[in-house]
Amino acid sequence: MASKSWLNFLVFLCGSAIGFFLCSQLLSILLREEAAIQPNMLHNDPHARHSDDNGHSHLKGQMNFNADSSQHKDENIDVAENLYQKVKILCWVMTSPQNLEKKAKHVKATWAQRCNKVLFMSSEENQDFPTVGLKTKEGREQLYWKTIKAFQYVHDHYLEDADWFMKADDDTYVIVDNLRWLLSKYNPEQPIYFGRRFKPYVKQGYMSGGAGYVLSKEALRRFVNAFKTEKCTHSSSIEDLALGRCMEIINVEAGDSRDTIGKETFHPFVPEHHLIKGYLPKTFWYWNYNYYPPIEGPGCCSDIAVSFHYVDGTTMYELEYLVYHLRPYGYLYRYQPALPENILKEINQVNRKEDTKIKLGNP
């Protein structure tokens, strides 16, 4: 009897050890898969858009890639300058007191310089940075409150200073010049907004908060007025989804932000997550959320991409260099989408000499 009990005990121990080993191996595989996506993301929550700061102790201060412009003094930027005047964009960046030095200052040193006007929105005012104090609390549950108050502030103080109003996070990188091309085809008095379009929960879809989204002037008017008339309320702490529901209620169209050949321009992750096949497992929420069929690999992203998300300070400068400085010698751009005729005509009037005439458009 004693030997049988001892045998049962040994079987139990062996079974427990094997079970523990298999569970630990499975957990390790799952954790590695999650870490491969983004170590600092809340992976199972498509609306968790702010990553934790990685420290980046080597990044002591902000850099200015445009300080030494001697290499680019003869660069022809007539088109970009004309669009800067014709398509005026106010950018507001959602940040927090603890992220001014870790994140927001790198946005300020890079892409934000190309907005016609930029504002940093925080829970507290900081006159040195500076930030607009929205007098809210911090935390994920406050994101929609901050968004509502930020758009109200922009509407009350800067409505006539821009045509379009872009919201971005402090870990979003935006190629503002490409955004201007996208918006140049539209009238800011049209009730419409653009971003990375997701499909669940809202009939017309809604725009991913992390990839950023941009409202027309009329969309901004309607959004602010909807809270005055109580057509919309603070119905959820999930900022992008709640804003999307409000937009549908007030008949603001969810626009198609893809380029002329159907490639996406707004991206909710860093480039590598979209460009490398298999980086995002098929069980990941992303594949079920896209309004348009998503593509992975080199075909994922437009040549005139507008935004990427979860971009840390170091990567901000890497993207700034790759987008605005690195050039392959001897190549002309293969994909040059057309400009609206009225803008193209004005540019060519400025460039009267035949050798400097700008020819833009698909062949």
UniProtKB/Swiss-Prot annotation:
Residues that bind Mn(2+): 169, 171, 309
GO terms classed as biological process: angiogenesis; core 1 O-glycan biosynthetic process; intestinal epithelial cell development; kidney development; protein O-linked glycosylation
One annotated Gene Ontology cellular component of this protein: membrane
Entries under InterPro entries matching the protein: C1GALT1/C1GALT1_chp1 (IPR026050), Fringe-like_glycosylTrfase (IPR003378)
Residues that hold UDP according to the record: 94, 138-140, 146, 169, 309-310
Disulfide-bond pairs as recorded: 91-115, 232-246, 300-301
Mutant phenotype after disruption: Mice develop brain hemorrhage that cause death at 14 dpc during development. They express the nonsialylated Tn antigen and brains form a chaotic microvascular network with distorted capillary lumens and defective association of endothelial cells with pericytes and extracellular matrix.
Recorded topology in the membrane: Single-pass type II membrane protein
Molecular function GO terms recorded: galactosyltransferase activity; glycoprotein-N-acetylgalactosamine 3-beta-galactosyltransferase activity; metal ion binding; nucleotide binding
Keywords: Angiogenesis, Developmental protein, Differentiation, Disulfide bond, Glycosyltransferase, Manganese, Membrane, Metal-binding, Nucleotide-binding, Phosphoprotein, Signal-anchor, Transferase, Transmembrane, Transmembrane helix
Family, per entry: Belongs to the glycosyltransferase 31 family. Beta3-Gal-T subfamily.
Subunit (UniProt): Homodimer; disulfide-linked. Interacts with the C1GALT1C1 chaperone; required for galactosyltransferase activity.
Protein name: Glycoprotein-N-acetylgalactosamine 3-beta-galactosyltransferase 1
Annotated source species: Mus musculus
Gene it is expressed from: C1galt1
